[in-house]
């Protein structure tokens, strides 16, 4: 392990021990805010500190065993020789774990997200594919125990969606889905195609971390135009007969959001405002990512929705992720929600990329 990394780990261990002492002091216990803040810091430092303590212990064991190798007692020397390989393997494993712990954490990883799927080129087939993608994400979300909340939907003329927006809530949603933003291309024979020709169409997906309720972004009410309209529901006994749907336009940027899912205008307005804040923040973050991308490629992408990331080839049952040259012949499983087949390799590559960066900068 590099000296610079060991120094960083030593500092983290010392801080962990210091915070542990502070948490036992009466003055800290009496101050709820400080106690809560230090408890959170202690919990964050605990895994890496305990791992580093195990690493130091293993290194000390290795030093002791190397000394025993020089012993005149042949039995002791033989025993030490047998133990050395085991301890060396332990050190290698702990070294790897420590490097993972040192990877900078994405502050958005624990957040809920807004998912937007929009039909692109390809007309009706693109809208149908947008529906297929939304179903894939919904199935995956259900398998993770996440909640899915529809915000708005514009239905395609022959099925699927021209655009659909939903909020997905649960544990570490953004950490799992942040690699999905970009253009998704589909190659398949449409049901209306009598000649059996393969058509190509595309959809764009945007994954945006939800803004905190404590207002990560300030919006001047004077910059908003708020319109109400009648929700375009499917009809039936619960048909929406009031102007409960909300459309909010942020005048300076031209960003427009709509929400028609709830029957209450108040609830639709609250959802639309949350989505607006998320979109405005996402636009700012995307701008920063594009600037960073000039110096460093990122698997999470630049935020450019036109960046083609994946192809779904139905005749061959093949999915290709172009960012890491990943090809999987389990397309039907993936479309049924087994998205881990794609997400896990992307996460591994992303972490390897971060580890390489860590090595370069240290």
Swiss-Prot record:
SMART domains: PCRF. Peptide chain release factor 1 directs the termination of translation in response to the peptide chain termination codons UAG and UAA. Disulfide bonds: none annotated. The modification N5-methylglutamine is found at residue 237. Pfam families: PCRF, RF-1. Belongs to the prokaryotic/mitochondrial release factor family. It is found in: Cytoplasm. Keywords: Cytoplasm, Methylation, Protein biosynthesis. One of its GO terms (molecular function) is translation release factor activity, codon specific. SUPFAM superfamilies: Release factor. GO terms for cellular component: cytoplasm. It comes from the Bacteria. Methylated by PrmC. Methylation increases the termination efficiency of RF1. This is Peptide chain release factor 1. The keyword NAD does not apply.
């Amino acid at each position: 392990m590099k000296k610079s990394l060991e120094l960083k780990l030593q500092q983290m261990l010392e801080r962990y021990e210091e915070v542990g002492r502070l948490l036992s002091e009466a003055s800290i216990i009496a101050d709820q805010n400080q106690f809560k803040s230090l408890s959170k810091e202690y919990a964050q430092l605990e895994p890496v500190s305990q791992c580093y303590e195990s690493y130091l212990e293993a290194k000390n064991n290795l030093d002791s065993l190397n000394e025993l190798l020089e012993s005149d007692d042949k039995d002791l020397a033989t025993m030490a020789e047998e133990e050395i390989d085991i301890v060396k393997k332990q050190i290698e494993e702990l070294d790897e774990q420590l490097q993972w712990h040192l990877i900078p954490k994405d502050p958005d990883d624990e957040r809920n997200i807004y998912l937007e799927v929009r039909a692109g080129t390809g007309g009706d087939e693109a809208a149908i594919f947008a529906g297929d993608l939304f179903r894939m994400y919904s199935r995956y979300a259900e398998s993770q125990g996440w909640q899915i909340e529809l915000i708005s939907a514009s239905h395609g003329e022959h099925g699927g969606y021209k655009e659909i927006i939903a909020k997905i809530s649960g544990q570490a949603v953004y950490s799992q889905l942040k690699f999905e933003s970009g253009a998704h291309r589909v190659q398949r024979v449409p049901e209306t195609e009598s000649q059996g020709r393969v058509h190509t169409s595309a959809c764009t997906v945007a994954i945006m971390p939800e803004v905190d309720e404590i207002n990560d972004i300030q919006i001047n009410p004077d910059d908003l135009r708020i319109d109400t309209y009648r929700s375009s529901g499917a009809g039936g006994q619960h048909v929406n007969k009031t102007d409960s749907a909300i459309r909010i336009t942020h005048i300076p940027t031209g960003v427009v959001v709509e929400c028609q899912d709830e029957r209450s205008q108040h609830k639709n307005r609250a959802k639309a405002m949350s989505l607006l804040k998320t979109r405005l923040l996402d636009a700012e973050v995307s701008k920063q990512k594009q600037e960073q991308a000039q110096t460093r490629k990122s698997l999470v992408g630049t935020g450019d929705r036109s960046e083609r990331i994946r192809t779904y080839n139905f005749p061959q049952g093949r999915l290709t992720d172009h960012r890491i040259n990943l090809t999987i012949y389990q397309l039907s499983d993936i479309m049924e929600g087994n998205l881990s087949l794609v997400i896990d390799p992307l996460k591994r590559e992303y972490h390897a990329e971060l580890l390489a960066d860590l090595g370069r900068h240290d």
